[in-house]
């Protein structure tokens, strides 16, 4: 706890300066405990997943810090930090790799690219009606935010698709059957966390599909930030029946029809 309190105070001083009030451990704990809202359709709600993709984080693989603002049931802002996400999507090996992690070969490929010192660490931002943008996690790198857009691909047979790594709450077999029926020939790129949404938003992948196993309820913090990022990048996110995801029902996505699909608007149709 002491390390967390020290980091909080350091961050406050960095952004506020000498006027920042130093917080005690009890102050920090009290602030954390305020995050007990049950959500809902009324008012403004911050939707936070502080470490999305916990297993990816532990393994040194993909994870995200994901934050979204919902106002009267509608997503308005999304911010997602992806510390291990490669800057360049073309380093991904869809045909030979099932992982978005850091094998020695992948690291070599990332470093060999035209990354100008920025080879990993991406922050995505989106504001409703203003598009989605990406810039480096490392603030010392001098890069202006760049606008990201979803893939223009329309042919399902050539589509690159991504899905969750974990089988515990996602039916990879069902997803594979859907991909086969659509004629998708590419192997899936399996990624921890909402980095999957970032991959679709900047066109590393054309489609994200997740079909949860029976009885599993999708939590809003696992999707909110990623959904607005894809939508503001020109994509569409819905359940398998084509309905928008409902974030206004509380802590869970209510009324979900079978699964979640995120893609470019043209391909989604």
Roles of regions detected by a PLM:
Residues 1-51, 74, 84-87, 138, ...:
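N-terminal subdomain of lithium-sensitive/metallo-dependent phosphomonoesterases centered on the IMPase/IPPase/PAP
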